[in-house]
Amino acid sequence: MNSNFNQHFERIKELRALLNKANYSYYVLDSPEIDDSVYDQLYRELIEIENIHPSLITDDSPSQRLGGVPSKGFKNVEHNIPLLSLDNAFNLNEVEAWYGRISKLISSENKNIKKVYDPELICELKIDGNAISLRYENGILTRATTRGDGKTGEDITTNIRTISTIPLRLLLENPPLWVEIRGEAFMPNNIFNKLNIERKNNDQPLFANPRNSCAGTLRQLDPKIVASRKLDFFAYSLYFPENWEPTDNNFKKPISQSESLEFLKNIGFKVNTTYETTKTLNEANKYYKYWEVKKDFLAYATDGIVVKIDKFEIQNLLGATNKAPRWAIAVKYPAEEKATKLRKIIFQVGRSGAVTPVAEFESIELAGTSVNRATLHNAKRLASLDLHYEDTIIVRKAGEIIPEVIRVIKEFRKVDAKLVQLPQNCPECNSKLILESNEAITKCINYRCAAKLKGLLRHWVSKGSMNIDGLGEKIINQLVNEGYVKSIADLYKLEIDSLLELERFGEKSANNLLIEINESKNKNWHKQLYGLGIPHIGEANAKSLSNNFNSIEELNAIAKESPEKISNIYGFGNEMKDAIVKWFDDSNNQTLIKELKAIGFSLKESLDSNYNSNQSNVFDGKSFVLTGTLDSLTRDEAKELIESAGGKVSSSISKKTDFLVSGEKAGSKLNKAQELGVKIINENELKLLL
């Protein structure tokens, strides 16, 4: 048996070495050494041996990349070396001013230099992702953290293990006791676009940009979701003990940023190879201008360049402020603007009846994507632009994300061009439009408007409300267009014959949808309330209302007789109160309430609720913050309990915080709560209060 174990022990070391080398060749060098089938065979053999001998599983094994069970949350950890941000320059003149300052500073700090010193520079692309710090101990990845505030970040080690371009073990013989690697995690553009297509097909909200998508992915509690999104990583700096010297003759200790990038590549990391060393600022300016034009052809997002002093000796001489190193500066690209021709204005009608003007124009390339439309938001914005049909307009992407029309080139306007004006009638149902008192929002007030109905139905079936997955936008459009559904209540009167007449419906899928629709009648009171689509009432506000009023009848009566009780709810105000009063004043909504109750909706707190009406308001007006790992509850479960009892959960501590619920390994929030005198309780005390 020992002989068998020893054989497996040696074989497992051999397999890991082969697989790690194959990963490095494939993901970092982009030069595969073995076929996929051979890799799969080696990987399966590794898994089989690890299943036989679980004690041989180590953190650096390729089998550990996909992670295990979902995490309950992320703990805060202090950076061993502060992860500073960079000072920004927004034009080349500011870069010249920075260069002049540091040249003089170097000369004044180093007495051996008799004149103003012009240091060698290195220019790198500024990747628009998320800064990550990696700590390796004896060559093995032990911790990965986000930037956070530069001093403290979140431990996301489990998620970082899923990124194939981050080695779990360094390709370095006799590594130092510790190494810290800094770099940028990012989502490649093609992965981002594919993910958004999937989300659109599933009726999920789209991600705004690759940077935000990457940040959200890294904070996923389930590492398998992180692995599925195929994040990437560029390493750009490293720190190691001063007295360490490599024993491998193939490596030499880097003494500059350019050498450190080569070193990083050799020990297993992917680095961005677009960097250049320059002897003059003029060459750095050329690098900036080149990539300002070429950036849209890259496979990842970049929002500028970073200019650094190349030699570590000079970097150490210059040092850093509390926020940023003096030896580097980020140079941002200006927001890209392009001229194009306005083709037409369409007017979209939302579920509240608000009419939004949208400009459609000749297609242009902005920030790497094709753009041919942009929202104009409301009547006031439309008027301020003074748009005429066939105008030449300037379009940019706000924050490199959302297209917006910023101005008109009036010199190119045709003499007989017609002014773009808001329609007098709804573009969907032809009803008379009204202009709200603030003179910004134009609305259709026809309750039976098909566009409003479609929007309301999409809201009703959304995850926060009834969560009817089978009812996507296309099916809703068909149901309304064919006249099968004229109100929310009609969804619950659908028959299988009607569904079978729609596209792509068979008997099984139609039956499944009808079952799903019928089961949604059992949703909680706050979800039913949210689904009604009362303006300004989001999910959190619907929960607050359901905690204060046990039924639609009670809320209806309060709206009519004592509306001030609504505005007195914690987090509410006159705007929400007025919206609720106005909603209940509408006879169409009163009819909807009757219809929903007639088909089986309770529109009230269920009898088996965890708390009765007296208990449910125990935290009314109280603000909570959660920190650390609780004994038996996840953070989401604790948040649900607090909110269901009328409380509000915030992410940050302030003087207005009433309670900090603290668990094991509490972070900096605990210290801040103590400083501010906030009451600190544990999970058991929270349950006692409930």
From Swiss-Prot:
- SMART domains this protein is in? BRCT, HhH1, LIGANc
InterPro entries per the UniProt record, alphabetical: BRCT_dom (IPR001357), BRCT_dom_sf (IPR036420), DisA/LigA_HHH (IPR041663), DNA_ligase (IPR001679), DNA_ligase_CS (IPR033136), DNAligase_adenylation (IPR013839), DNAligase_N (IPR013840), Hlx-hairpin-Hlx_DNA-bd_motif (IPR003583)
The record lists Zn(2+) as bound by 426, 429, 444, 449
Give the source's domain of life in one word. Answer: Bacteria
Example GO CC term: the record gives: cytosol
Q: Residue ranges of the BRCT domain? A: 614-690
Q: What class of enzyme is it?
A: ligase
Kindly state which keywords UniProt assigns to this record, in alphabetical order: DNA damage, DNA repair, DNA replication, Ligase, Magnesium, Manganese, Metal-binding, NAD, Zinc
Q: Which residues cross the membrane?
A: none
Kindly list the GO molecular function terms attached to this UniProt entry: DNA binding; DNA ligase (NAD+) activity; metal ion binding
Q: In the Enzyme Commission scheme, what number(s) does this protein have? A: 6.5.1.2
One GO BP: DNA replication
SUPFAM superfamilies in alphabetical order: BRCT domain (SSF52113), DNA ligase/mRNA capping enzyme, catalytic domain (SSF56091), Nucleic acid-binding proteins (SSF50249), RuvA domain 2-like (SSF47781)
Q: Where is the active site?
A: 126 (n6-amp-lysine intermediate)
Name the PROSITE patterns on file.
Answer: BRCT, DNA_LIGASE_N2
What residues does NAD(+) bind to? 36-40, 85-86, 124, 147, 184, 308, 332
Family assignment from sequence similarity: Belongs to the NAD-dependent DNA ligase family. LigA subfamily.
NCBIfam families associated with the record: dnlj (TIGR00575), PRK07956.1 (NF005932)
Output this protein's name: DNA ligase
* Organism of origin: Prochlorococcus marinus (strain NATL2A)
